[in-house]
């Protein structure tokens, strides 16, 4: 199940709702922050990486308190797949972090196929020991993608 939504349309809350269905397998924030080794089914809810991710996210909210109200995404909850695309640098997230006109131009015209191939492989890796049906939520590329 893949859900696409423009920024600010509720895709994040939809990912939370889809994650409530035990048949769905969302990408978890802690997995995205630390993909390897892939999680084990037996320790999926108690993996030590969860506490680390929760701490990292809480630190981020301490540094920028307004962020919690604008985009709340707990370290032990689901996250958008756009984060995996960022690992291959084919993500619109990079456009908002730095002002690099040459990157913007490259991103607008590049072949994004390799990014989705990487995304597919990353999801396969993460699912290799846990199984389940993915419920992937991501933002649309918008005018720059």
Annotate the PLM regions:
Residues 25-34:
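Short beta-strand-centered segment that lines the nucleotide-binding/catalytic pocket of NTP-utilizing
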């Amino acid at each position: 199940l893949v859900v696409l939504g423009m920024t600010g349309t509720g895709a994040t809350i939809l990912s939370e709702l889809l994650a409530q269905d035990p048949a769905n397998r969302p990408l978890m924030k802690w997995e995205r922050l630390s993909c390897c080794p892939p999680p084990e089914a037996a320790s999926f809810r108690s993996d030590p990486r969860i506490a680390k991710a929760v701490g990292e996210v809480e630190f981020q909210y301490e540094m920028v308190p307004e962020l919690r109200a604008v985009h709340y995404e707990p370290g032990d909850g689901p996250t958008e797949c756009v984060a995996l695309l960022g690992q291959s640098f084919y993500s619109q997230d990079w456009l908002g972090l730095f002002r690099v006109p040459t990157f913007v131009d490259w991103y607008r015209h590049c072949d994004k196929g390799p990014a989705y191939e990487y995304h597919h492989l990353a999801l396969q890796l993460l699912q290799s020991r846990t199984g389940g049906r993915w419920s992937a939520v991501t933002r649309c590329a918008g005018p720059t993608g």
